Curated annotation (Swiss-Prot):
Zn(2+) binds at residues 120, 126, 147-148. This is Voltage-gated potassium channel KCNC4. Keywords: Glycoprotein, Ion channel, Ion transport, Membrane, Metal-binding, Phosphoprotein, Potassium, Potassium channel, Potassium transport, Transmembrane, Transmembrane helix, Transport, Voltage-gated channel, Zinc. It is a multi-pass membrane protein. The cytoplasmic N-terminus mediates N-type inactivation. Belongs to the potassium channel family. C (Shaw) (TC 1.A.1.2) subfamily. Kv3.4/KCNC4 sub-subfamily. It comes from Mus musculus (Mouse). One of its GO terms (molecular function) is voltage-gated potassium channel activity. Residues 1-230, 303-316, 369-384, 477-628 are cytoplasmic. Homotetramer. Heterotetramer of potassium channel proteins. Residues 1-28 are annotated as: Inactivation gate.
Amino acid sequence: MISSVCVSSYRGRKSGNKPPSKTCLKEEMAKGEASEKIIINVGGTRHETYRSTLRTLPGTRLAWLADPDGGGRPESDGGGAGSSGSSGGGGGGGGCEFFFDRHPGVFAYVLNYYRTGKLHCPADVCGPLFEEELTFWGIDETDVEPCCWMTYRQHRDAEEALDIFESPDGGGGGAGPGDEAGDDERELALQRLGPHEGGSGPGAGSGGCRGWQPRMWALFEDPYSSRAARVVAFASLFFILVSITTFCLETHEAFNIDRNVTEIHRVGNITSVRFRREVETEPILTYIEGVCVMWFTLEFLVRIVCCPDTLDFVKNLLNIIDFVAILPFYLEVGLSGLSSKAARDVLGFLRVVRFVRILRIFKLTRHFVGLRVLGHTLRASTNEFLLLIIFLALGVLIFATMIYYAERIGARPSDPRGNDHTDFKNIPIGFWWAVVTMTTLGYGDMYPKTWSGMLVGALCALAGVLTIAMPVPVIVNNFGMYYSLAMAKQKLPKKRKKHVPRPPQLESPIYCKSEETSPRDSTYSDTSPPAREEGVVERKRADSKQNGDANAVLSDEEGAGLTQPLALAPTPEERRALRRSGTRDRNKKAAACFLLSAGDYACADGSVRKEGNVEPKACVPVSHTCAL
């Protein structure tokens, strides 16, 4: 809008006077820019920009500030964690100031995204924090530039690795009596065992013994849950090592006894005598193996009876190994007294199947972090292993064919097949030589004897070194990542349950803040979707004639609508999901809010009126608006 001074100057120019001065035009342009400017105070850092800049990304939180009267707001959470909007007063000219209690450093990147259209991720900010800030400001994470995408994804990759990696202290996180994670695990186990199986409740009298199930499960599954659990873990480790040692000693000649067995067969009037030799193991080794199997059986039965989820227990690979390693011993003991041919055949098969006992070595993964890290590394590096196998297969096929034809070059004319002077009779035999050469083993059982074959052998060795060297660094990086995560998680201090104070009630005198007690001049915040769905929350105020101050009072309907979500406590599964996903919202209150300018007045009837059109006792200044 052009001022009266410039209008008179313009009219004077038509009648022959001087044109409007440059100073006047600059003042008018400055006034127009001032009315378009907006000041955003984030965490105490003031940012100044134009409303047109904020409108470049419609549907976001800052776009709502640029057009507070627009009705096209998306149905999304408008509260956010720890957010509030307030008028800062001296916005300068016609501009206004909005305050948000968010991270000021991240907001600089967000505002720069509005200006340039390119969203970059700061390297000095933790990934989950940047993700939360993007969610609060209503920006999609897919808008992150490719140059910063790996930095942004780094935290999520670590979280995914933590999700599939059990805690290094045995699954329970080394939970102490007041450990929050340990309490959640125990609560989850009680829920899976049933409502009356926890030993506390109306039905605890009849099923009180079932209340020991979580404790027994932790005793045999979590070595760090108690001292008794550590003793059980040490005993299990001892029996595993003894069983593996016994298995190895059974194959030594010093522990094998040769026995001559005489068999007499009578068929009618004909009697035949047969002599055969049998090899028996020292009885002491059999007794030791029997004691170990008894321990493993007891451990297996206790764990399957007290497990929270039987289906998960049955599908666990280590539990399958336990069962397969225990079963042959009992079958062998049961069939040892039988003399039939079928029984002897079964016993012979069971003796061959004894090798499954060596699989008990994998049970050590429950007690050693490094073995668990190795297992997760192998699973995470499946693609790299497949790539390595494909490279080796291609190299073996190529060099086996080349060595076969290279060795035929030096064949004598009298040799029609051309393979009398070489070991490479055909291409399939060359496969073995190519594998041994590419893996740099070089047994020496087969080697080229012609100059062309030697050249192919040199190329095969070089190709093998390069082929194996390419995927190995990726596998090593995976192992390093998992190992560092395991060590970091093992050294993390235990999280104790903290006392969370109850939120102030609506009728509490500290719930609403006045201008004398609040450091801000007036209060702003964002419109939340619950407020849009249930209607605009009315702020009723009454004029107190005793002290002349305005007291903010909320209606009962509003109080019920605001306090109801606060009363819902998250379940243990939800708390675990929140910790795994990296969400670290500390404030769960999402309050209904208004974008009011300084000088507006909230009236008793719920309406908002501008300054200058205010009845004396009907409205109160926005500076006394409740800060939710």
